[in-house]
Regions:
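Flexible "cap/lid" loop of the alpha/beta hydrolase fold
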Residues: 100-137, 175-184
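Catalytic histidine-centered segment of alpha/beta-hydrolase-like enzymes
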Residues: 238-249
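Short beta-strand/loop motif that positions the catalytic acidic residue
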Residues: 198, 204-206, 210
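Conserved alpha/beta-hydrolase
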Residues: 28-51
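Active-site loop/oxyanion-hole signature of alpha/beta-hydrolase fold enzymes
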Residues: 44-80
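Active-site glycine-rich loops that stabilize anionic/oxyanionic intermediates
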Residues: 13-17, 86, 208-209
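Conserved alpha/beta-hydrolase "acid-adjacent" motif
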Residues: 211-220
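Gly/Ala-rich beta-loop-alpha elbow adjacent to hydrolase catalytic centers
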Residues: 83-88, 92
Length: 249
């Protein structure tokens, strides 16, 4: 039908449950969009149920999570607008490059293949996970202290702790290992078709206080698209951290 708005698919990243998108879904629904926020493979319907069964989310990697969303998109009436946060942003970029979306927004998106910067704050935030190589096949959780550093550093401790309690879930560590080793693998799951000339527009956002995906990573991600004439833009929120999709700011 002429004038019908594209559906919207929200894609969460590691450690946040899909229901954390609920306020966004309501906002988009009020504007006339059909908005859905499916979880990753193995995610239960609630935060509590997902926490109770961490093994169900273990060992899922970037490719099978992407394929999970491909199947969801195939069931929609039209190609959607993709909005992803962190690793959800990376997956949104992959899907856009595969022509499974009409447009995409990567909010503090995880690094794709070709991004070589590894800022110290990112190393500190993930060191405990990489210290044990067997974590690659496990589900891992963040303590309130770890969440405060990686997500809530731009917030009060009280708000950070409240968000940790409300939204966090165990998540597969495998995507972290895949992204970290992308430079060593020609066919890395973190590879995105950045040269696609026919894809829809892409907006990347970055938080100036983000410890998990510092600005240097997002700026380098933007450079990976330099060989495509498709629209790619970048917006900075200078006072925001990685929690910007769920916090009060």
């Amino acid at each position: 039908m002429p004038g019908t708005k594209a559906p919207v698919v929200f894609i969460h990243g590691l450690w946040l449950h899909a229901t954390s998108w609920a306020p966004w879904q309501e906002l988009f629904a009020e504007a006339g969009y059909e908005a859905v926020a499916p979880g990753w493979p193995g995610d239960a319907d609630t935060v509590e149920a997902t926490r109770a069964n961490p093994d169900s989310v273990a060992n899922h990697g970037i490719d099978d999570v992407t394929e999970h969303y491909v199947k969801i998109i195939d069931g929609l009436p039209a190609r959607p607008i993709l909005i992803g946060h962190s690793f959800g942003g990376l997956i949104a970029e992959k899907l856009l490059g595969m022509d499974y979306g009409v447009a995409a927004i990567g909010i503090d998106a995880a690094q794709i293949k070709g991004v070589l910067q590894v800022p110290l704050s990112q190393i500190r935030g993930s060191l405990s996970i990489f210290a044990n190589p067997t974590n690659r096949h496990k589900a891992v959780s963040l303590t309130a202290k770890e969440f405060r550093y990686s997500f809530g550093n731009a917030l009060s401790e009280e708000e950070s702790n409240a968000l940790h309690e409300r939204w966090t879930i165990p998540s597969p560590a495998r995507p972290l290992f895949e992204a970290a080793s992308a430079a060593l693998s020609p066919h890395s799951p973190a590879k995105v078709d950045t040269a696609n000339e026919d894809r829809g527009p892409l907006l990347l956002t970055m938080g100036g206080k983000d410890h998990t995906v510092p600005e240097a990573i997002t700026k380098s991600t933007l450079k990976q698209y330099r060989h495509s004439s498709a629209v790619t833009d970048l917006v900075e929120f200078s006072d925001r951290g990685h929690s910007l999709t769920i916090d009060s700011g």
